[in-house]
Amino acid sequence: MRLPIFLDTDPGIDDAVAIAAAIFAPELDLQLMTTVAGNVSVEKTTRNALQLLHFWNAEIPLAQGAAVPLVRAPRNAASVHGESGMAGYDFVEHNRSPLDKPAFLAIRDALMRAPEPVTLVAIGPLTNIALLLSQCPECKQYIRRLVIMGGSAGRGNCTPNAEFNIAADPEAAACVFRSGIEIVMCGLDVTNQAILTPDYLATLPELNRTGKMLHALFSHYRSGSMQSGLRMHDLCAIAWLVRPDLFTLKPCFVAVETQGEFTSGTTVVDIDGCLSKPANVQVALDLDVKGFQQWVAEVLALAS
């Protein structure tokens, strides 16, 4: 039976690969997409998500989400993804539009209609998820688990210690991590290992229309290079859903620093139990890289 999922995203070039996998992996049933400000503004992430859905002729409802973090000024990652968020490919015009409700209410309504608890996947800042949990706490019982791309048990990529998705809205992340829902965290500890090799990247233009499109986007992606390999951060959250055997997880207490002058946005991952607090997150710490690369090749071959 296919696993029903809702995907919260901020496309973003590596988001595009994750969305492809969520749509075409035969094990998954992508029922709702929502957008959030992150890599670029929410207007741009929404436009990009709609372009991708149209490209794949995917009839999946999409709702636009939060334009700004809960309390902070917005930041972005245009230096990594380009000013549009998905530079490099000319998508055809379409007349699709988002639902006439904000993302957190769209998630709430879809959860309440679902016949069974649903897995949420968040591969951008956690603003929409925090709004859902704070404004609609009755929804917790309908969430099977939350799988995120975000955080790190070690070094950051936005500050010395903070990963971008968490640092973009630390207060939202703190709310989510305190919520009591089951969380799987695919952070930089694994996503920095999730590299598509130059040899594989070179095959994409001949793979199918998706491969050609992604190859064009990748030429503008700055998380690695076409010559050294590209890191597929967001794709790890989708990969865990389908192939959890590729990941090594450890239950840990995780908190989000919101006050530090230099450490705001850091995920404090208590790997050794120093704080004597109960684990609230399953933290991915290692990845079978060869197995991941093989799975990516298999799922993108289906993305026609």
From Swiss-Prot:
PROSITE patterns: IUNH
Residues of the signal peptide: none
Keyword Coiled coil: no
InterPro entries for this protein: I/U_nuclsd_hydro_CS, Inosine/uridine_hydrolase_dom, IUNH, Nucleosid_hydro_RihC_nonspecif, Ribo_hydro-like
GO terms (BP aspect): purine nucleobase metabolic process; purine nucleoside catabolic process; pyrimidine nucleobase metabolic process
Superkingdom, taxonomy of origin: Bacteria
Any one GO MF annotation of this record: uridine nucleosidase activity
Gene3D superfamilies with a match to the protein in the record: Ribonucleoside hydrolase-like
Active site positions: 233
Keyword entries, A-Z: Glycosidase, Hydrolase
GO cellular component, one term: cytosol
EC annotation from Swiss-Prot or TrEMBL: 3.2.-.-
The keyword Hydrolase appears for this protein: yes
Record family assignment: Belongs to the IUNH family. RihC subfamily.
Function: Hydrolyzes both purine and pyrimidine ribonucleosides with a broad-substrate specificity.
Name this polypeptide is given: Non-specific ribonucleoside hydrolase RihC
Annotated source species: Escherichia coli (strain SMS-3-5 / SECEC)
Lineage per the UniProt record: Bacteria, Pseudomonadati, Pseudomonadota, Gammaproteobacteria, Enterobacterales
